[in-house]
Regions:
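Noncatalytic modules at the cell exterior or secretory-pathway interfaces
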Residues: 130-144
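Acidic, histidine-bearing metal-coordination/catalytic regions of metal-dependent phosphoesterases
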Residues: 164-351, 577, 583, 587-610
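Extended active-site neighborhood of metal-dependent phosphoesterases/phosphodiesterases
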Residues: 308-310, 319-337, 395-482, 509, ...
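Core catalytic region of metal-dependent phosphoesterases/phosphodiesterases
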Residues: 364-422, 516
Length: 610
C-alpha cells in the first residue's frame, strides 16, 4: 500500500546506518450530402495505415498520395473544406502564397486561372486565381495534401457591379467575412493584421473576403503524417507534471503517463516534515482519473493512458513528498516534491519563458540549467508554443522528456500559443494540462484563467481566440483583484518584435484594461526574440513603471527571428534563448526582474518599486 515510500525509507535508513487527436474542430457542424473533410481524412489515414508499408508511407509524396485517393475522396477534399452561399453571381478569387506552386491541388483541376499579377504581403509573395460561380452554394477545397504554407483566403467579386453581395451559411462556423483593405486580419485564428496594402488593381480594392482559419491549413495533410516517438510510454509512470486547477494554497494537480497496459492510477503523498521523522507517517492516497489517448499516426506508440489527480485539503505554505503509480509494488515513480502557496503575503520567485517550440533537446538544457540556478522558484510560466506540433504527441513526448525533473517539482503555468492550436483547436493541450476553469463564459474552460499566489495575481489569456470574447471577463477579474502585483500571460505580443508583425486587436481590447487597472507586466512570446518595452500607457511611453505597463517578449527555444527598431523598445536582442526570473520582495514592495541566457549570464534586468 505504501510500497514506494517504504522502499525509499528503508533504503534511506540503511544508508543512514552505514553513514508524456485528435483535434476536434469547433463551430458550426458540417452539413451536406458528403462526409466532412475531417471524417474523410480520418478514413484515408486509417486505410493508408492498414494497407501501405511503413517504408512506402515515409517515402510518399503529394502526387503519390493523390493517386491513391478515390474520386469521392478527391471531390470532398476539393469542395467541402469551406462552403457558403451567395445571392448573386460572383468571381471567386483565391489569394495564396506563390511558393505553394501547384497547391491547392484542385485549383487548376476546377478551372481557376491566374490573374497575372503578384504582390508582397508581410514579406510573402502572393498571387491571385479566379473563377466565376453562379448564385447558390459554393464549395472550396483544402489548402494542400502536404501541410505547411499559410492558408489561402478567398475574395468575392459580384459579376455585376450594381448588385449587393450577401454571403450566408458560411462553414466552418468560425470563419468570417471581411473586406480587402488596410488592416485586414486575413485569419480568424491569428491576430496579426495586414500592413498597409500595396497598390491593388482597382477592381480588387474593398472586395468581400472569406477570412479563413490558418491552422486548418493542415486539415488534409497526408505527407509526413506518420511518426515514431523517441520516447514511447512504458508501464512505469513518466511525464509527471504539476499544475494548478484550484487554489494553489490548498490544492495540487498532478498528471502523468503510462503505457496501454496500465489502466488506473493513484498518488501517495505525505507532508515532508512527517516523512522526515524517525517514524514517518503513513502516506495518504488519492485515486486518479484515467483516459485513453489514441493517435493513429504514431506508429510505435499509438495508445497511452494519461492520469490526473487533484489533491485537495492541503495546508498552505507546506512541502509535500509524493509518488504516482498504479498500486503495484514496482509501478511507482521516484519520489518528488511540491510546496503549496503561502497562506499569507510572503516573498516568492517565479520563472517565465517564451516559446520552446523548436530544438526541444537544447531547450531542455536551458530549463534544467535554469532550475539548477534558481531552485527556489515557486512555479514556471510558459507563454505559449511549448511545442511545434501541438496535436502530435511525439512532440509533447520530447517536451516532457526534456523537462523531466523540473515540472514534477515545480508547477507549470502555460498559455496557449498558435502551435498548440494546430489544426484550429488545442485539443491535445487541453487533454494534457489540468488548469483552472474560472475563465470567460462562452469559451472552453482552461483556455483563459486566473490564479493568485501570495500578493500577486496572474491573468492567463488566449490570443488564438478573439480578444473581445475575453475582454469583459478580463475587466471583471482585474477590477476584483486586490493583489499588489498583477501580471498578464499570453502568446501574441501587444507590442511586436518581429518585422512587419502587429496585433492591434490586443491593443484595442486589452491594453486599455491594463492601463485602467495598472497591470505591472505582460509576459508574451511568439516573435522569437527578446524585447522589453519602456513602461507604456495609452500606447505611449511614460516616465516610469508607476504610470505604465512593461511588455516582455522572449524565446527559450532555438528558432529566432529578426527584430525591428521600435520606438517602444527599451532593450532588445536576437538569436538568444533566455529564461526570466521574477523575485517579488515584500520589504519595500519590490519586483526584481532578471533575464538570463543559456549560460546563465545576466542579459537584462529591471527593478519596479511601489
Amino acid at each position: 500500500m505504501t510500497n514506494m515510500f517504504n522502499q525509499v525509507q528503508q533504503r534511506s535508513a540503511r544508508l543512514a546506518l552505514a553513514a508524456l487527436l485528435l483535434s476536434t474542430a469547433l463551430g458550426q457542424a458540417h452539413v451536406g450530402e458528403h462526409p466532412s473533410v475531417h471524417d474523410t481524412v480520418a478514413g484515408i489515414i486509417d486505410r493508408f495505415r492498414k494497407t501501405i508499408s511503413l517504408k512506402e508511407l515515409t517515402a510518399m509524396d503529394a502526387s503519390k498520395a493523390k493517386s491513391l485517393l478515390t474520386e469521392k475522396e478527391l471531390h470532398i477534399l476539393a469542395t467541402e473544406h469551406i462552403t457558403f452561399r451567395v445571392n448573386v453571381p460572383v468571381k471567386v478569387i483565391i489569394i495564396r502564397e506563390t511558393a505553394m506552386g501547384d497547391k491547392p491541388f484542385w485549383l487548376k483541376d476546377r478551372g481557376f486561372i491566374p490573374m497575372g499579377f503578384k504582390i508582397t504581403l508581410q514579406g510573402t509573395e502572393v498571387d491571385f486565381w479566379m473563377k466565376d460561380f453562379e448564385v447558390g452554394r459554393i464549395g472550396l477545397g483544402v489548402n494542400s495534401l502536404t501541410g505547411g504554407n499559410s492558408h489561402y483566403i478567398a475574395a468575392l467579386m459580384p459579376l455585376k457591379k450594381e448588385t449587393k453581395l450577401e454571403v450566408t451559411e458560411l462553414y466552418p462556423g468560425q470563419l468570417r467575412v471581411g473586406s480587402l483593405k488596410d488592416g485586414l486580419q486575413p485569419f480568424v485564428d491569428r491576430p496579426e493584421a495586414m500592413p498597409k496594402l500595396p497598390v491593388l488593381p482597382g477592381v480588387l480594392s474593398g472586395l468581400a473576403v472569406i477570412r479563413t482559419q490558418n491552422e486548418s491549413r493542415d486539415d488534409a495533410k497526408l505527407i509526413n503524417l506518420f511518426h515514431n516517438t523517441n520516447h514511447p510510454a512504458l508501464a512505469k509512470p513518466d511525464q509527471v507534471m504539476l499544475t494548478w486547477s484550484g487554489d494553489p494554497k490548498t490544492t495540487q494537480s498532478i498528471q502523468w503517463r503510462t503505457g496501454p497496459s496500465i489502466t488506473k492510477g493513484e498518488v501517495q503523498w505525505v507532508k515532508k516534515s512527517d516523512y522526515n521523522r524517525f517514524q514517518p507517517a503513513q502516506p495518504k492516497q488519492t485515486k486518479a482519473t484515467t483516459f485513453k489517448m489514441e493517435n493513429a499516426n504514431l506508429l510505435n506508440d499509438p495508445i497511452v493512458h494519461r492520469h490526473t489527480v487533484t489533491i485537495t485539503g492541503l495546508d498552505p505554505g507546506t512541502a509535500y513528498i509524493y509518488s504516482v503509480g498504479d498500486g503495484s509494488d514496482d509501478g511507482w515513480s521516484e519520489l518528488a516534491e511540491f510546496t503549496t502557496a503561502p497562506g499569507r503575503t510572503e516573498p516568492f520567485s517565479f520563472m517565465y519563458m517564451g516559446d520552446a517550440q523548436n530544438g526541444l533537446e537544447r531547450w531542455g538544457s536551458l530549463v534544467q540549467s535554469a532550475y539548477r540556478q534558481r531552485p527556489d522558484v515557486a512555479f514556471c510560466i510558459m507563454a505559449g508554443d511549448l511545442v511545434d506540433r501541438g496535436n502530435e504527441r511525439d512532440d509533447w513526448d520530447s517536451f516532457f522528456h526534456s523537462s523531466r525533473g523540473v515540472y514534477d517539482h515545480r508547477p507549470v503555468v502555460p498559455a496557449i500559443g498558435n502551435h498548440e492550436n494546430q489544426g484550429g483547436h488545442p485539443g491535445m493541450y487541453l487533454q494534457m494540462f489540468d488548469l483552472p476553469k474560472n475563465g470567460p463564459e462562452g469559451i472552453e474552460p482552461e483556455r483563459a484563467y486566473t490564479f493568485r499566489y501570495s500578493n500577486a495575481e496572474f491573468f492567463v489569456l488566449d490570443t488564438n481566440l478573439t480578444m473581445e470574447s475575453q475582454a469583459v471577463w478580463l475587466e471583471k477579474a482585474l477590477a476584483a483583484s486586490t493583489a499588489t502585483w498583477k501580471f498578464a500571460v499570453y502568446h501574441h505580443p501587444a507590442y511586436s518584435s518581429k518585422p512587419e508583425r502587429d496585433n492591434p486587436s490586443i491593443r484595442k481590447h486589452w491594453t486599455p484594461l491594463f492601463d485602467k487597472y495598472h497591470l505591472d507586466m505582460a509576459l508574451q512570446g511568439h516573435d522569437h526574440a527578446y524585447l522589453r518595452t519602456y513602461p507604456i500607457k495609452d500606447q505611449k511611453k511614460v516616465a516610469n513603471t508607476a504610470e505604465g505597463t512593461v511588455y516582455i517578449v522572449s524565446v527559450s527555444g532555438t528558432k529566432y527571428y529578426e527584430q525591428d527598431p521600435r520606438e517602444y523598445t527599451e532593450f532588445g536582442m536576437t538569436n538568444t534563448s533566455t529564461f526570466q526570473v521574477l523575485d517579488i520582495q515584500i520589504s519595500g514592495n519590490r519586483l526584481v526582474y532578471r533575464s538570463y541566457d543559456t549560460e546563465g549570464k545576466l542579459r537584462d534586468n529591471l527593478i519596479i518599486e511601489k
